[in-house]
């Protein structure tokens, strides 16, 4: 069952691609080419928005100062293309903000944001890398130190565990207690009666 639907799809795809009827070719040719009024409306129509120096058929459309130099930075050649006169171009170029002589230009916010973000990210990554390196190095040095102590090559000056104070001597045995003389060697006092007074 799985093979039959896929075979049907392959057959339909090949039949569509290999269809060479003359009626179909004529319709495709008519769809590609436009009539003269439609082509003219594409080139100079008001529906198109100028795209400021981005593939907008500049060779066929007249130069526009706003599009060429005010919306974007332009070069001397683009300004010369608009003015078509060296004296007018010189006058404009002296007052133009981005003329290469300095001047106050606008801040490129996108470039500034990308630069700051990448700088901060670089600092954070460098900090994390340094932290990881130091942590790994400290762990490795501790591991080497314990291995050397176990083999007896390094004897620590101060013991790792503090020594407990010596235990007090335990109680003497019965024989030792009888042999020793001391303050408490006297026999107990005699008991007068086993009864308690009421």
UniProtKB/Swiss-Prot annotation:
The keyword Transmembrane helix applies. Residues 162-171 have a biased composition (Pro residues). A motif (PPXY motif) lies at residues 188-191. The keyword Electron transport does not apply. A motif (LPXY motif) lies at residues 171-174. Residues 18-51 form a propeptide. The modification 4-carboxyglutamate is found at residue 72. Pfam families: Gla. The chain crosses the membrane at residues 112-132. Residues 52-98 form the Gla domain. Residues 133-198 are cytoplasmic. InterPro entries: Coagulation_fac-like_Gla_dom, GLA-like_dom_SF, GLA_domain, Peptidase_S1_coag_factors. Gamma-carboxyglutamate residues are formed by vitamin K dependent carboxylation. These residues are essential for the binding of calcium. Changing residue 191 to A: No effect on interaction with NEDD4. One of its GO terms (molecular function) is calcium ion binding. It is found in: Cell membrane. Disulfide bonds join 69-74. Residues 156-198 are annotated as: Disordered. GO terms for cellular component: extracellular region; membrane; plasma membrane. Keywords: Cell membrane, Disulfide bond, Gamma-carboxyglutamic acid, Membrane, Signal, Transmembrane, Transmembrane helix. Interacts with NEDD4. Interacts with transcriptional coactivator YAP1. This is Transmembrane gamma-carboxyglutamic acid protein 2. It comes from Mus musculus (Mouse).
